[in-house]
């Protein structure tokens, strides 16, 4: 198909050559057609000619319509105008077209249909004469001239695909029917609008105009012919023109206007068409427009969107009479010196002429060449044309109108350099010609028929005028315009819609501001660098301090009115804005790199400081502009944090480092610089906070209530703006903190205030709590630090580094607790050695070994173990009661943090019950003080820490309601115990309030109910904490129901939680909470009631599941009493919820509430027994070495074999005894001959490790030790396995004696005892593996001991050694004369002699069970 279409292709220059030869003889189109078809084709090719378009040339062969007789009606206008050539159907006025073009110039891009009104005016003879002097110049195929501000959009396509060609042919076939109808309308209208021949004869080029009129009428009727078809005798063109080869490429045939000849193809779309004719012409052009997109050359610099702009959607009768009159006035007035008026009429708007000389305007080389040619060729133009001064006068206005334009110009790769006076200082801008006006098709729409678009002349093929001289530099702006030069942003604003897609990687895409100003016009570094900027059309100006108006291309570009839907327009604007933001960030990255290089130096010079200040100022402007342009983009890119890190944090740290450096010459100057930087940062973030509120239309005061969950959803921009505002406040707090540190002061009140404000804006963010914890660490308030670190971990976006901070805090607390305990011991004893002489605390082992001394300390002694108090509770109570409230509060805080340190680190949990007991004792004494040393806020912090301990210790991978870890149960038990003490205190205070109300005379009438207003102050301090804990219990019922295993506490400290709650419920029912009415629904005269504890704990993850129902009260009511009324209401609901549980804990019986909660131990036994019986049959693979040896000896072979084996056993025993005696003698000799140091073992029995014989022979004694609750019984797993084997016995042993059956029965009882105790989760009973791992249950007790060395005795001894952690720095004395002291908390209970010897050699205390019971005074 391409070959067939190629046969009908013809060049525009060939047509002009033929017409130039045949015009004097005959002007008929038939002769011209014959000559064209008979002309041979030449082989020389041009690299920049347009590829032949399928479907365009085929229309040339269609039959031509005859020229209507009325085609000369407009010739009288040509005589007066000298710039306009004949039009096809002269019925359409030109003035209206021009007027509408002017209107579109001010409002946006000119539609391509409006261009045709200007395309239809050919040039006069004077201009044609000048065009003959342009000759051909040598061009490079892909030469591209750089134009500032112009960016290639997409890669040009070389040719259309076969599918596209078929689609074009289908469209051409459809055009034929429509053009037939158009021909009829054209013929009728041309007859009706025939111009006066008398006026045509007055024009020197009248004959040519008529010929051109007829020819163009024929070709436009077809819609696609060769546009450059007419000849002019005055041009002197030779008869033969150059034919181009197959590979030649041509430019677009849809030209806007031509200056070459009256017969140019620019007259193809005349303004003289009737309304029907113009409408049909526009429809035809619209259907042909897709072919333009395929005429893209690789060497072209045109954007693909230039063709897209030429595709108008609605091409109806849009040329009003007003537009035609406006166009006629502007064009006809050019000959009478109205150029200046036209320039004034169109000033302030981007004006571009799309002639070749105007398109080359922005290139310095092109402009210089054009000015040289303008100076050297006016005479030649006159002599060649043979015209007089009248033509020269007509030519000058034409040049003035065409020579100037404003805007960003895009030159094709091989655009002709014009010889017109584009560079003339008196040339005025062409009024009707806008960016999308006459010639909006860009460089691709220019053909090769006009002299101003060609670098060569067929008459002078060897002459290259465009390359003779060097051109002067082009100016971007109009110098003759009477308005101020257009700024970079304005030019981009008028041009922006021309580039719909900005995805190219062309580095020339970003414009440069003409003149000496920089591309980024920052005002520099000064204290007040944020003045109010102008308005840009999308975002108001006051929010852009110190910035130029944003580029029109990005934020305020006029878009094509008919080519994009509103959604596409929005997306288009979004894409452009995203590109601007990315550009800003790229510039900021470059500035930050320079700033980092400056900061990396060891010393910074004064010039470096000034450069640093300038870079920081630019960074602040760039980052602030990004935040104010698109807050969502800024949040996704972390612009807020990058701003703080790059512009402030690294500079502050550098200055702080320099201030601390002793080698710095002038530290005071650096300190002053640091303070100035901090002051500047404070001003900047204050300003940014205000701009955020104004830009995104919100007020910070409306969101400072501290609510994490709001009833109405926030707007997306407000949500992101609040997050940015919170970060600004955190930065303000950091700046205030740095200022205090730089000034060597510790008043962090201002920083704390900023952090609290930030916390109120977004309570779910963990960063403000982390910063508040830092301040607490600086001021040595450890409870506040632990509280805020836990809040930062229990946030929706936690700060994970707080975990390490908590670990270090708890380690420090542990050291302080140990020091406090040691101090208490020293106060109790007169000297460190006095405690050794007490009869209860000293047990001296007497034996032959004089170098070994064991010091046994009874648990009742004050130094018995870590965390335990004296056995005399009354003395201890008296000791706590004698302390002042402040000292008692300090001691309680230390014990409380020590207990939670064990829960958090899970280290040292064996002493947790003792520490918890101490905490509860001190807390109980604290609550008795009035007023309470613990305020409302401090009490809320204590409850919050208890909630976090339960929340943090829950199983992460278990979602079953019944699964709770041991740590979680212990944490819940501690929290519930403190809650019960708190409730018990509230019950007492309520009774006091009732008595006070009865005694008051004004309340005699209402004696049954307790008024909320009569609450004592201490009760008002405690009610918020009780309410918060009840909220947590309602949100997480699985953590306390069924009730956790209670701690082993003394009777004076242990409190039944549920009985206490029942008593509290009974007294609470007498409280009248309706003293202030509460409402659920909002109203005009109501206000929302927010409790202080709810606001303080908002965003705390453990409380997010708690019910949060809004409550409203009257505006005139007392808010304090209303808050207490709400608390009482919530507590009543909570107590009723306890009665409504699936397994109720409270019940209403006999007119009062009672506790029906099950006993935790009993419930644990039931659950554990079921688990134990289920797994009992699985423990069949127990290996017991000693039992197998004894059973084989007793049950296999005859009596002779037994006697033989016993004899061997006795012989081996004698040998072992002899060896032991020998070793003892050797040891004695060695000890006598060596200077041996005495060893002291300080034994504080806490962990008791019995062996298998202990359970068989002394099970009752072990039970008594366990019931004493003073020791922890540790059972090695190998002992349990041995007991299992003994309890099951040997199935093949039918001759077992009575002793074996007795052993089997005792072993069975021992197993039952252990299972029962483990199932009840006895805190004083544990199982231990051979590797030292503690087990809370023995449901799974199989252990692989294949890799262990030694027998079962060695495994039992290894369990004891697990609790012997000797460190040389702890037991080695400073002098050689002092004995070595070892601390032991474990005691091995066994009667086995071999095991006792092994224990002694490893310095493990060992006793038999009866002796230990006697010493411990148990039973």
From Swiss-Prot:
Provide the transmembrane region boundaries. none
Query: Where is the region Interaction with telomeric DNA?
Result: 114-503
Q: Phosphoserine (modified residue): where?
A: 203, 332, 484, 831, 870, 874
Superkingdom of this protein's organism = Eukaryota
Where does it localize? Nucleus, Nucleolus; Chromosome, Telomere; Cytoplasm, Cytosol
Q: Which residues form a coiled coil?
A: 163-193, 567-625, 1197-1239
Q: Which residues fall in a compositionally biased region of kind Acidic residues?
A: 303-313
Q: Where is this region: EJC-binding motif 2?
A: 133-153
| UniProt entry keywords in alphabetical sequence | Chromosome, Coiled coil, Cytoplasm, DNA-binding, Endonuclease, Hydrolase, Manganese, Metal-binding, Methylation, Nonsense-mediated mRNA decay, Nuclease, Nucleus, Phosphoprotein, Telomere
Whether Membrane counts among this entry's keywords is no
Say if the entry is tagged with keyword Isomerase. no
Name the consequence of residue 1251 to N.
Answer: Loss of endonuclease activity and nonsense-mediated RNA decay
Citing just one GO molecular function, the answer is: ribonucleoprotein complex binding
Report residue spans for region: Disordered.
Answer: 25-79, 99-165, 177-405, 419-472, 854-883
The subunit structure is: May form homooligomers. Associated component of the telomerase holoenzyme complex. Interacts with TERT, independently of the telomerase RNA. Interacts with SMG1, SMG5, SMG7, UPF1, UPF2, UPF3B and the PP2A catalytic subunits. Also interacts with the exon junction complex (EJC) composed at least of CASC3, EIF4A3, MAGOH and RBM8A; required for the process of nonsense-mediated mRNA decay. Interacts with DHX34; the interaction is RNA-independent.
Q: Which function does this protein serve?
A: Component of the telomerase ribonucleoprotein (RNP) complex that is essential for the replication of chromosome termini. May have a general role in telomere regulation. Promotes in vitro the ability of TERT to elongate telomeres. Overexpression induces telomere uncapping, chromosomal end-to-end fusions (telomeric DNA persists at the fusion points) and did not perturb TRF2 telomeric localization. Binds to the single-stranded 5'-(GTGTGG)(4)GTGT-3' telomeric DNA, but not to a telomerase RNA template component (TER).
Q: What is the protein name given in its UniProt record?
A: Telomerase-binding protein EST1A
User: What high-level taxonomic lineage is stated for the organism?
Assistant: Eukaryota, Metazoa, Chordata, Craniata, Vertebrata
């Amino acid at each position: 198909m391409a070959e067939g279409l190629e046969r009908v292709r013809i060049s525009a220059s060939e047509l002009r050559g033929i017409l130039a030869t045949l015009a004097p003889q005959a002007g008929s189109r038939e002769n011209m057609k014959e000559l064209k078809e008979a002309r041979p084709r030449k082989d020389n090719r041009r690299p920049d000619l347009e590829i032949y378009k399928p479907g365009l040339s085929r229309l040339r062969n269609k039959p031509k319509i005859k020229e209507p007789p009325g085609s000369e009606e407009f010739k009288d206008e040509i005589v007066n105008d000298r710039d306009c050539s004949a039009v096809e159907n002269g019925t359409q006025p030109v003035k209206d077209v021009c007027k509408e073009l002017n209107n579109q110039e001010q409002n946006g891009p000119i539609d391509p249909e409006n261009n045709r009104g200007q395309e239809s005016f050919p040039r006069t003879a004077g201009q044609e004469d000048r065009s003959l002097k342009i000759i051909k110049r040598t061009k490079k195929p892909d030469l591209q001239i750089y134009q500032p501000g112009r960016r290639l959009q997409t890669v040009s396509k070389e040719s259309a695909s076969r599918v596209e060609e078929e689609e074009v042919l289908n469209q051409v076939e459809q055009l034929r029917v429509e053009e037939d109808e158009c021909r009829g309308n054209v013929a009728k209208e041309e007859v009706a609008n025939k111009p006066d021949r008398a006026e045509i004869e007055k024009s020197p080029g009248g004959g040519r105009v008529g010929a051109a009129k007829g020819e163009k009428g024929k070709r436009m009727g077809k819609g696609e012919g060769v546009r450059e078809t007419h000849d002019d005798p005055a041009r002197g063109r030779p008869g033969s023109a150059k034919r181009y080869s197959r590979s030649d490429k041509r430019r677009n045939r849809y030209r806007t206007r031509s200056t070459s000849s009256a017969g140019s193809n620019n007259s193809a779309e005349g303004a003289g068409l009737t309304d029907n004719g113009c409408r049909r012409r526009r429809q035809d052009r619209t259907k042909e427009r897709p072919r333009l997109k395929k005429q893209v050359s690789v060497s072209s610099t045109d954007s693909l969107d230039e063709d897209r702009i030429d595709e108008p959607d609605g091409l109806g009768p849009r040329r009003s009479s007003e537009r035609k009159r406006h166009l006629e006035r502007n064009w006809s007035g050019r000959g009478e010196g109205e150029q200046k008026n036209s320039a004034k009429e169109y000033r302030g708007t981007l004006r571009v002429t799309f002639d070749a000389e105007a398109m080359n305007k922005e290139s310095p080389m092109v402009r210089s060449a054009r000015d040289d040619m303008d100076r050297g060729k006016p005479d030649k133009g006159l002599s060649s044309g043979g015209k007089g001064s009248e033509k020269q006068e007509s030519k000058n206005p034409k040049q003035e109108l065409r020579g100037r334009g404003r805007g960003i110009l895009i030159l094709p790769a091989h655009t002709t350099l014009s010889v017109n006076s584009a560079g003339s200082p008196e040339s005025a801008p062409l009024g009707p010609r806008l960016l999308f006006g006459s010639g909006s098709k860009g460089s691709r729409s220019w053909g090769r028929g006009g002299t101003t678009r060609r670098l060569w002349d067929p008459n002078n093929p060897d002459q290259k005028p465009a390359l003779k001289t060097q051109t002067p530099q082009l100016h971007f702006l109009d110098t003759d315009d009477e308005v101020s030069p257009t700024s970079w942003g304005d030019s981009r604003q008028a041009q922006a819609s021309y580039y719909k897609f900005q995805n190219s990687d062309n580095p020339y895409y970003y414009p440069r501001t003409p003149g000496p100003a920089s591309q980024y016009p920052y005002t520099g570094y000064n204290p007040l660098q944020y003045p109010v900027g102008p308005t840009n059309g999308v975002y108001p100006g006051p929010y852009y301090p110190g910035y130029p108006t944003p580029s029109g291309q990005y934020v305020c570009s006029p878009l094509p009115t008919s080519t994009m839907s509103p959604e596409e327009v929005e997306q288009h604007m979004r894409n452009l804005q995203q590109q601007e933001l990315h550009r800003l960030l790229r510039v900021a990255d470059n500035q930050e790199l320079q700033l980092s290089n400056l900061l990396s130096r060891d010393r910074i010079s004064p010039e470096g400081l000034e450069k640093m200040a300038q870079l920081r100022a630019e960074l602040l402007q760039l980052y602030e502009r990004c935040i104010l342009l698109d807050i969502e983009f800024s949040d996704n890119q972390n612009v807020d944090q990058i701003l703080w890190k790059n512009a402030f944090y690294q500079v502050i740290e550098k200055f702080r480092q320099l201030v601390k450096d002793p080698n710095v010459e002038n530290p005071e100057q650096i300190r002053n610089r640091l303070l100035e930087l901090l002051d500047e940062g404070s001003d900047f973030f204050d300003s940014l906070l205000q701009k955020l509120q104004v830009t995104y239309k919100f007020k910070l005061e409306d969101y400072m209530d501290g609510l994490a969950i709001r009833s109405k959803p926030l707007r997306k921009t407000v949500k992101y703006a609040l997050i940015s505002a919170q970060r600004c406040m955190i930065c303000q707090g950091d700046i205030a903190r740095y200022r205090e540190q730089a000034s060597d002061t510790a008043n962090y009140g201002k920083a704390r205030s900023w952090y609290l404000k930030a916390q109120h804006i977004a309570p779910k963010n963990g960063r403000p709590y982390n910063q508040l914890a830092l301040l607490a660490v600086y001021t040595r308030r450890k409870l506040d630090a632990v509280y805020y670190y836990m809040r930062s971990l229990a946030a929706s976006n936690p700060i994970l580094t707080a975990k390490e901070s908590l670990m270090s805090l708890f380690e420090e607390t542990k050291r302080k607790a140990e020091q406090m305990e040691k101090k208490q011991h020293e106060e109790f004893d007169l000297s460190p050695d006095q405690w050794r002489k007490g009869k209860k605390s000293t047990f001296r082992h007497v034996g032959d070994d004089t170098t070994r001394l064991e010091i046994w300390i009874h648990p009742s002694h004050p130094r018995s173990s870590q965390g335990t108090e004296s056995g005399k509770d009354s003395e201890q109570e008296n000791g706590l009661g004698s302390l002042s409230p402040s000292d008692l509060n300090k001691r309680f805080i230390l014990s409380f943090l020590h207990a939670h340190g064990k829960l958090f680190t899970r280290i040292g949990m064996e002493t947790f019950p003792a520490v918890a007991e101490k905490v509860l004792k001190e807390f109980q004494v604290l609550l008795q003080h009035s007023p309470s040393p613990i305020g409302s806020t401090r009490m809320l912090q204590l409850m919050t820490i208890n909630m976090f301990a339960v929340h943090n210790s829950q199983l992460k991978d278990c979602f079953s309601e019944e699964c709770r870890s041991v740590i979680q149960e212990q944490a819940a038990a501690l929290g519930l115990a403190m809650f019960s003490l708190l409730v018990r205190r509230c019950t007492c205070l309520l009774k006091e309030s009732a008595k006070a109300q009865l005694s008051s005379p004004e309340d005699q009438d209402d004696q049954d109910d307790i008024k909320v207003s009569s609450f004592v102050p201490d009760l008002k301090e405690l009610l918020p904490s009780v309410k918060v804990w009840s909220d947590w219990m309602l949100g997480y019922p699985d953590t306390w129901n069924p009730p956790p295993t209670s701690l082993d506490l003394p009777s004076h400290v242990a409190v039944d939680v549920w009985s206490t709650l029942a008593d509290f419920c009974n007294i609470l029912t007498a409280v009248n909470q309706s003293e202030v009415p509460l409402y659920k629904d909002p109203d005009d005269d109501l206000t929302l009631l927010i409790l202080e504890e709810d606001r303080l704990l908002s965003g705390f993850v453990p409380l997010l599941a708690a019910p949060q129902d809004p409550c409203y009260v009257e505006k005139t009511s007392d808010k304090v009493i209303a808050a207490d009324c709400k608390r009482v209401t919530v507590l009543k609901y909570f107590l009723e919820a306890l009665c409504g549980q699936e397994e109720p804990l409270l019940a209403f019986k006999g007119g009062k509430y009672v506790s029906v909660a099950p006993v935790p131990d009993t419930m644990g036994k039931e659950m554990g027994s079921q688990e134990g019986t289920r797994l009992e049959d699985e423990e069949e693979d127990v290996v017991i070495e000693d039992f197998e040896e004894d059973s084989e000896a007793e049950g296999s072979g005859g009596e002779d074999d037994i006697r033989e084996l016993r004899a061997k056993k006795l012989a081996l025993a004698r040998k072992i005894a002899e060896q032991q005696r020998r070793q003892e003698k050797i040891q004695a000799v060695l000890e006598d001959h060596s200077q041996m140091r005495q060893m002291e073992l300080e034994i504080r029995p806490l962990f008791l490790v019995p062996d298998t014989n202990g359970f068989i022979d002394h099970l009752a004694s072990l039970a008594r030790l366990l019931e004493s609750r003073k020791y922890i019984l540790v059972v090695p797993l190998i002992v349990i396995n041995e007991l299992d084997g003994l309890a099951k016995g040997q199935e093949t042993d039918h001759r077992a004696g009575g002793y074996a059956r007795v052993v089997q029965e005792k072993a069975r009882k021992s197993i039952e005892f252990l299972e029962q105790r483990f199932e009840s989760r006895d805190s004083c009973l544990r199982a231990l593996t051979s590797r030292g791992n503690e087990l809370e249950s023995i449901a799974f007790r199989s252990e692989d001991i294949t890799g262990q060395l030694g027998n079962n005795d060695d495994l039992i001894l290894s369990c004891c050694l697990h609790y012997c952690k000797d460190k040389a720095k702890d037991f080695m004395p400073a002098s050689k004369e002092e004995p070595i002291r070892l601390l032991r908390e474990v005691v091995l209970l066994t009667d086995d002699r071999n095991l006792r010897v092994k224990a002694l050699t490893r310095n493990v205390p060992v006793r038999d069970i009866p002796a230990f019971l006697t010493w411990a005074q148990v039973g």
